Swiss-Prot record:
Binding site for Zn(2+): 596, 600, 700, 704
Comment on bound cofactor: Binds 1 zinc ion per subunit.
Lineage of source species: Archaea, Methanobacteriati, Methanobacteriota, Methanomada group, Methanococci
Superkingdom to which the source organism belongs: Archaea
SUPFAM superfamilies reported in the protein's UniProt record: Class II aaRS and biotin synthetases (SSF55681), Putative anticodon-binding domain of alanyl-tRNA synthetase (AlaRS) (SSF101353), ThrRS/AlaRS common domain (SSF55186), Translation proteins (SSF50447)
Record text about domains: Consists of three domains; the N-terminal catalytic domain, the editing domain and the C-terminal C-Ala domain. The editing domain removes incorrectly charged amino acids, while the C-Ala domain, along with tRNA(Ala), serves as a bridge to cooperatively bring together the editing and aminoacylation centers thus stimulating deacylation of misacylated tRNAs.
Species of origin: Methanococcus maripaludis (strain C5 / ATCC BAA-1333)
General function of this protein: Catalyzes the attachment of alanine to tRNA(Ala) in a two-step reaction: alanine is first activated by ATP to form Ala-AMP and then transferred to the acceptor end of tRNA(Ala). Also edits incorrectly charged Ser-tRNA(Ala) and Gly-tRNA(Ala) via its editing domain.
Record's keyword annotation contains Lyase: no
Protein family per UniProt: Belongs to the class-II aminoacyl-tRNA synthetase family.
EC number: 6.1.1.7
Cofactor(s) of this protein: Zn(2+)
Pfam families per record: tRNA-synt_2c, tRNA_SAD
Record protein name field: Alanine--tRNA ligase
Subcellular location: Cytoplasm
Amino acid sequence: MEINHDYRVKLFDELGFERKQCTECNQWFWTLDKDRTTCGDSPCDEYSFIGSPITSKKYTYNEMVKEFTNFFAEKGHSPVKRSPVVAKRWRDDILLTIASIAVFQPWVTSGLVKPVKNPLVIAQPCIRLNDIDNVGRTGRHLTCFTMGAHHAFNSKDEYKYWTDKTVEYCFELMKRLGIDEKTVTFIESWWEGGGNAGPCYEVITHGVELATLVFMQYKKVGNDYEEIPLKIVDTGYGIERFAWASQGTPTVYESLFSEVIEKLKKDAGIPEVDEKIMAESATLAGLMDIENVGDLRVLRQKVAEKIGMDVDELDKLISPLEYIYAIADHTRCLSFMFGDGIVPSNVKEGYLARLVLRKTLRYMEKIGISMSIKDIIAMQLENMKEIYPELSEMKEYIMDVLDSEEKKYIQTVNRGRGIVERMAVSKSEITLDDLIELYDSNGIPPEIVKDVVDEINKKGKKTIAITVPDNFYTIVAERHEEEKPEEVVSTKKELPELEVSETELLFFKHPTQVEFEAKVLKTVEKYVLLDKTLFYAEGGGQKYDIGQLNGIEVSDVQKKNGIVFHKVSDISKFKEGDTVKGTLNWENRLKLMRNHTATHVINAAATRVLGKHIWQTGSNVDTEKGRLDITHYERISREQVKEIERIANEIVLSKMPVNSTFMDRNDSEQKYGFTIYQGGVVPGDTLRIIEIEGTDVEACGGTHCSNTSEVGYIKVLKTERIQDGVERLEYSTGMGSVSEIAVLEDILIDSAEILGIPNDQLPKTVKRFFEEWKEQKKTIEELQKKVGELVKYELADKFEKHGDYEVLVEQVSGTPNELMSIADNLAIGNKLIVLMNENDYLLCKRGENVELSMKELIRNIGKGGGKDNLAQGKYSETKEQITEKISQILNK
């Protein structure tokens, strides 16, 4: 469709705004300044607010949040509480909250759900990591920023306001803050994002963009656009930029983090840098419109020329301060990430949090900050307490996770040096892909890789090329920022697409009913489709019900597009239009109800024991056992498991009612928060809420007991770490728990009988046996070492010269451990050892001066694998044949 948007609004006509075309960038804009020839934005105009605040008073960040919110509240907008910075709490297409409108996507913007208020105002903290490498360097970039926004959702039935009022509100806010109205320009522009589009204004003053006013009214379809039912006012005001412009500080960082910056400077012993230098750098950064760090070296050169200083001297002077700026920004970002419950891991939002944290720790090391990161974040929490008290409520978790992650970081760095050294043996260049692989798979920062490679190059034995891009962390973050739907590999046959009415689910209204009558709508393959059913279809982690239809077994129940498919053993017994009698296997259903209710109970108990940060990432409810996957930053201890189990059974014994109600989506979120989505994102404007009174509330479509007392005894059977940052708890209920305890008891009794001791003596006896075994093992290892030393002398004369190396290929009697001990004694310098025993075991080990990979060698002379310095496997050829192959390899 052809779009011709008229950017003229009522305010422009009333006040005499003129439409002009910028002489620098050719963009069209509106201004009250008749003499203006440029649009006002950088790089067409430089920052003119640095050292010269543009508002009638200086505002702190907290004051600006309040001023913005109060202004729009006075204009009839209802203030709405911020959402978490973890967008995954309510949507499954992005990980982090990147804009205020993301809070209302996809449910409100699609028209499926009404907005909680209309119009509304929100000050939403957002996180974008696509500029993380620019933070600290350009003077304006932030990873975490607050998007102030007023939104209006206009429909056919409810119209609020559109372009005229939006521009009027913006201009009035500028005047209220004391900004000279002649300096304000409205640039005509176009916005696209998330599949939507619309015209917009970029609102500029003194060289800086303070707001964007978007009028979302189209859907992008290929290369064309379609109108959408809602006309959405989507504005974004940069709260931090307003505060910066009101203070006129050299960079945005001083306006936000002055206390933190001063303490970090003092701690690191960084001398004061002339404010003019930082102001010049920020101003030139604006003029260059820096959006990638490839331009930063050019920026540094321009600043050096402008102030008459050598570029290397300038770099040495301001780099430490830029690191401090970045640390200040990153620690605020981490405060929101961890405060909103992100658990560091190697995937998804946990990966991004760990990336920011490790980058911060690396910068702290680089400039020698002795303060702990916990102390810095504690300062940030205190400074934000007035506006975000909920972050301070998570302080204990935040401090614990920082402790845990800092230890992991140190271990990673220590281990990483060896990994890089081994990689470097067979490399002439460490590429960007290598750097990303080392970071993603092993957590090794690129700076550590470069340090190790530089050390190798200094030794002069070989030269390895390496270049670490200035925007490395941006590249890595962008690969992980967008949520990609997990590929689910189904073992079930794909259900057909059918045009029949959705199945009425009777178990919502009649959870204890066992029998029902229904009409057959259709039969397809082995499936019967009914107009109504009591059978629960597999979903939400819960297994399907089983039972009978007219006495014919129902062995599987699935759902697609609201239609329930009942798999029967004899489809010929059913015809369209028949009335059938359905009967549930109640014993099977009861087990599922108990285990599903137990999932909610254990999740609540785990939250009390481990903290509010835990989040359900998955569950599986079967008849015999259930399992619950939750985020947590360390292994759950034995004591914690016992406490979770104790609290869970306390909830059971407390006979808490389990209530099921259907609620409006907005009402549910407002009343209970986003924790209702623990079981996953639920579509629709109406949610089924399961509430265990005073214990747990979730949006859930499964079957549950009506009272916790019906669950029976809950036994946590085991925990395991299924991935970094995710713990799995496996449990049973009722008679299932009794059976599991009986199995454990049998193991205990059988073990005691084997040892001929009473049950209560088992731990003590096993401990004694283990200590004795360790002593014997130590003795055996010492004997093996001595044997190895003796054999060393026997084999010393059997080395043969092949190229630059001395090679030993020998068949030796002994266990793999004994052969390893012999090889350890012989593999030094330029010696290459190949040992075989009578059981076809093959061992290859090299001295430190041998460059040939043992992993590659063993693949050529046998079968096996290992590392570059040591490989093990099997052989099938004779000693002579193996020797000949090695000779050919070494004498190429």
